């Protein structure tokens, strides 16, 4: 499955992001995340915000050798800046684990966006030592808000997942990446919903130098993720 497709696309390494969509599934999700982790696959675990043992599970995520934590506020039904998340974020920050958030709009919850860029900015302010990866350029279909609230924050990486199908203004794509700082941009796809074949042409049309494209497509990610291995 995944490794076969990576071979087809000529991709050496990838990141798999797992989501605990319910309390009772949390431990099994992280067991699976640990089972698929390999030299080629970095693997993020997850905790459910309503799990009574969420803090203990974060310790287990680290003990399992997982590479970070993934939240999807729409699937897990919480606002990213909810006060109940503070102990969880404090624990993640103390463990030094990077955390990825689905950010912005999602078709599962089209009328209620749980991770608006302004909400994510509050989290970044409250936990300045927590390394955050804002998926979908920090806010799917919320690109103007990304420019207003998120650009240039040193504890934030922006990934490019699922950008090509939604971002119509390619000049804004370049403006966001350069405005944030190319050392904190990570190429991503959101496979299987999008693929490198769909996302790479957008990056290639953006006018970056070969060295800049290398930083975005793999060097930044390697520097970030190898700190945990």
What are these regions (language model features)?
Residues 6, 33, 61, 69, ...:
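Conserved, mostly hydrophobic/aromatic
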Residues 30, 51-55, 142-144, 166, ...:
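Short, well-ordered alpha-helical microsegments
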Residues 2-3, 30-34, 58-59, 85, ...:
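Generic structural signal for well-ordered alpha-helices
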Residues 1-13, 181-186, 197-229:
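Mid-to-C-terminal alpha-helical segments outside catalytic/metal-binding sites
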Residues 12-13, 21-107, 111-114:
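Active-site gating/metal-coordination segments in enzymes
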Residues 67-68, 81-186:
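Catalytic pocket-lining loop regions of alpha/beta-barrel enzymes
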Residues 61, 123, 132-133, 209, ...:
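A generic "structured core" feature
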Residues 17, 72, 188:
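Conserved residues at the C-terminal ends of beta-strands
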């Amino acid at each position: 499955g995944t490794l076969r497709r990576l071979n087809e696309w000529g991709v050496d390494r990838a990141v798999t992001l797992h989501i605990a969509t319910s309390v009772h599934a949390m431990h099994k999700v992280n067991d699976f995340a640990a089972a698929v982790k390999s030299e080629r696959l970095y693997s993020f675990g997850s905790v459910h915000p309503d799990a009574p043992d969420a803090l203990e599970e974060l310790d287990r995520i680290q003990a399992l050798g997982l590479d970070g934590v993934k939240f999807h506020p729409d699937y897990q039904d919480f606002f990213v800046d909810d006060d109940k998340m503070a102990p969880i974020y404090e624990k993640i920050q103390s463990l030094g684990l990077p955390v990825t958030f689905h950010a912005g709009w999602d078709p599962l919850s089209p009328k209620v966006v749980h991770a608006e860029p302004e909400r994510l900015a509050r989290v970044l302010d409250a936990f300045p030592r927590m390394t955050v990866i804002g998926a979908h350029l920090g806010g799917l279909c919320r690109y103007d808000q990304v420019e207003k609230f998120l650009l240039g924050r040193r504890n934030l990486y922006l990934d490019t997942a699922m950008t090509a199908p939604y971002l119509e203004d390619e000049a804004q794509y370049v403006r966001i990446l350069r405005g944030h700082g190319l050392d904190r941009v990570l190429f991503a796809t959101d496979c299987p919903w999008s693929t490198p074949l769909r996302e790479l042409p957008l990056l290639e049309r953006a006018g970056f130098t070969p060295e800049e494209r290398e930083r975005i497509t793999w060097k930044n990610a390697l520097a970030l993720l190898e700190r945990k291995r």
